[in-house]
Design a protein with these regions (language model features):
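Short hydrophobic alpha-helical segments used for membrane anchoring or interfacial signaling
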Residues: 351-356
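N-terminal Sec-pathway targeting helices
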Residues: 1-14, 19-22
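Beta-lactam-recognizing serine transpeptidase/beta-lactamase-like catalytic domain environment
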Residues: 308-317, 357-407, 412-643, 651
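Extracytoplasmic/periplasmic proteins that interact with beta-lactams or build/remodel peptidoglycan
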Residues: 70-350, 370-394
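Second-shell loop/turn segments in exported
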Residues: 22-25, 36-37, 53-58, 104-106, ...
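Core segments of small alpha/beta cavity-forming domains
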Residues: 25-72
Length: 665
């Protein structure tokens, strides 16, 4: 019996031993598992944990610190990510396993692919026999991996005639050669700082950078190449050196500053958010430089290669040629842009000029403005505070905002009334004097107008004399439903598809016109109505184009043809009636824009003054407007002009001679 039990025990032990052996073999660390774990640690940048996967022989050859430093410098230096391997073969050699595999990884120059092999030793699990050629097959322990970057040329921004609005220019780089400073280094540094408008601490910080030697040229600040007096003073200080450097340059400077925008060195936050840049890259900060950044910036050229201990190029791992940025040609006429800026530069205002036949935007002027060439060079904190705290907001692109249109809205009221058949050109209203209210339900609320005139109170005469009372009554006759649906059709409360962001025009704060008094005020361009200047230019183009609103655009097209933004924005008859009436605003001796007459040129236009106040009793600034277009001309122009603080300068009549000179040139 005991013998039987012993035999059974022995059999069980044998079975258990066999089972344990097979379980051990099944769950034993496989060499390919170690390789895959190693690659996973590379992707996770866990260099210390990579080191733990090395065999003892490798650890004796390289310390953990040196291993981490070498791998980290190489992988981070080439901007490696997403390494993947495909095992091709596993060869046994005693306790060793030799794995051949194909590796792929993303790097700053693109994808790097190579075949390689790795040897693993079974040391209580498979461990890696490591050397530098595990990083790249051709890499020896004394070699280095280098990354060479070639910067592309940033694309130019050109006007319609090919003139550069933004391109490459030169400036003067002010620097210091430390070994050539005089013995009175502190005194000289303070003097340099004072002349450059910076702190001595900022200079010393640059001089203390790790790469600086006595013979190094240490750039301190870039200034305009024309700063000859400043440069002469600086060169009198020992150790100062001035070199020429390339910069982004803007030929129109202030005249197109909000339009072109400007570039500056990328910030840390921008570098984290955007791909394809380095810490020294320039990036568009505002305007078209920002809008077209992806097209203008180009693509860096990158070469990643192995260099031997003698500094010789040994193997190119990947090479990507640089791609220069795209040149972008605009519809802008730089001469017109400059002329209009010169007219308005001392005021707070804007001009939008468009070809009403094609939609080409010929000028976008906003005043006052900053010198974008100074922004590229860099401004001091005091200079920046002066700009950002300026009450006249010189960085604001006024043409992108929305404003009360005043009487320039009256043609739109007329156009909606005629198009909806809720108003006819022959309709007349009965009232006398310069003040009117519908009835006693309005209480003390009255509509006022500036000028009494003889003749019928009809649409044409009301436009000629800019009669507020007529258009208030016309709006009431049109009705809230027709008015709001007509304005919705004109794309109020919508984003206008344009190259730059534009504020949405509105007819009220809540998207409704419910009160009679608000509807009446809306009729003559007051109330809560706010219109974007580019949008109103597009609306006025419908009076030129028999009712079709033309889409404005900024990027030049050969053989320009119009894109209709709103078909039949007004009926053909309505558009032609308004156009003919606006011609009389200029041609009629009593017209509010009679000063705009130019011999041989037919012009349709409308003056406007918008009151910026919340009640009739309040006194506040006004906005002056003048919107006009040439009729039946070979090269038609449509102008929208606005000036703030119009009660100080004559408003729309201040703008008329400016536009007149621009058309006559």
């Amino acid at each position: 019996m005991k013998k039987k039990i012993l035999i059974i025990v022995i059999i069980v032990l044998i079975i258990a031993g066999i089972g344990g052996y097979f379980y051990y073999k099944k769950n034993q660390n496989k060499p390919e598992d170690t390789l895959k774990e190693y690659v996973s640690k590379i992707n996770e940048e866990k260099y210390n944990e990579m080191y733990e996967l090395l065999n003892e022989n490798s650890k004796n050859k390289i310390s953990e610190e040196d291993f981490v430093t070498r791998n980290k410098k190489i992988y981070q230096g080439i901007d490696m990510s997403n390494m993947k391997i495909e095992v091709k073969n596993i060869q046994k050699s005693g306790k060793k396993r030799i794995i051949t595999y194909t590796a792929k990884m993303d790097a700053s120059g693109g994808e790097i692919t190579f075949d390689n092999e790795i040897t693993l030793n079974n040391e209580k699990g498979y461990k890696i026999d490591w050397s530098s050629n595990l990083i790249f097959p051709e890499l020896e322990d004394t070699d280095k991996v280098r990354v060479s970057t070639s910067k592309p040329s940033r694309g130019k921004i050109l006007d319609r005639n090919g003139k550069e609005l933004a391109g490459e220019g030169t400036a003067s780089s002010i620097g210091i050669v430390p070994g050539k400073l005089s013995e009175s280094k502190e005194e000289d540094t303070n003097k340099i700082a004072e002349l450059l408008g910076i702190t001595a601490d900022s200079i010393n910080k640059k001089l203390q950078a790790g790469w600086v030697t006595d013979d190094s040229f240490v750039p301190i600040k870039t200034v305009s190449a024309n700063e000859n007096e400043l440069k002469d003073k600086l060169l009198q200080i020992k150790g100062v050196k001035i070199t020429s450097t390339k910069i982004r340059s803007y030929s129109l400077g202030e005249a197109a500053s909000q339009l072109t925008g400007y570039v500056q060195t990328i910030t840390k936050e921008e570098l984290e958010e955007n791909e394809g840049y380095t810490s020294t890259s320039l990036i568009g900060k505002t305007g078209l430089e920002q809008k077209y950044e992806a097209r203008l910036k180009g693509k860096n050229g990158v070469e990643i290669y192995i260099e031997d201990k003698d500094g010789k190029r040994k193997k190119t791992l990947i090479k990507q040629d640089k791609v220069d940025g795209e040149n972008i040609k605009l519809t802008i006429d730089s001469e017109l842009q400059q002329n209009l800026y010169n007219e308005l530069k001392n005021d707070e205002g804007l001009f939008v000029v468009m070809n009403p036949a094609t939609g080409e935007v010929l000028a976008l002027v906003s005043t006052p403005a900053i010198d974008v060439n100074k922004m590229v060079l860099g401004v001091t904190s005091d200079e920046w505070n002066e700009i950002s705290n300026n009450e006249k907001t010189p960085m604001l692109a006024r043409y992108s905002q929305k404003y009360c249109p005043g009487s320039t809205f009256k043609p739109i009221t007329g156009g909606i009334g005629l198009s909806t058949n809720s108003l006819s050109a022959e309709d007349t209203f009965s009232y006398s004097g310069l003040s009117w209210q519908k009835d006693a339900s309005w209480g003390t609320y009255n509509i006022t107008t500036l000028t009494a005139y003889n003749g019928a109170k009809n649409l044409k005469n009301a436009l000629i004399h800019s009669d507020n009372i007529y258009f208030a009554q016309a709006a009431l006759k049109i009705g809230s439903k027709n008015m709001t649906s007509g304005l919705d059709k004109l794309k109020f409360n919508e984003d206008i598809d344009f190259d730059l962001n534009l504020a949405k025009s509105q007819y009220s704060n809540n998207g409704k016109i419910e009160k009679e008094t608000l509807l009446a005020d809306t009729g003559y361009g007051q109330g809560q109505i706010l219109v974007n200047p580019v949008h109103i230019a597009s609306i006025y183009s419908a009076f030129y184009n028999e009712g079709n609103m033309i889409k404005p655009y900024l990027e030049f097209k050969e053989n320009a043809s119009p894109t209709i933004l709103v078909e039949n924005a007004f009926s053909k008859d309505a558009a032609n009636e308004i156009k003919n009436d606006l011609i009389q605003v200029v041609e009629n001796p009593e017209g509010t824009a009679k000063d705009m007459r130019i011999n041989g040129t037919t012009i349709a236009g409308k003056t406007g003054t918008a009151e910026l106040k919340s009640s009739k009793d309040e006194k506040a600034d006004t906005i002056g407007w003048f919107d006009c277009f040439t009729v039946n001309s070979e090269n038609p122009y449509l102008f929208v002009g606005m000036v703030e603080k119009a009660n100080n300068n004559g408003g729309s009549h201040y703008l008329i001679p400016m536009i007149k000179r621009a058309i006559s040139k």
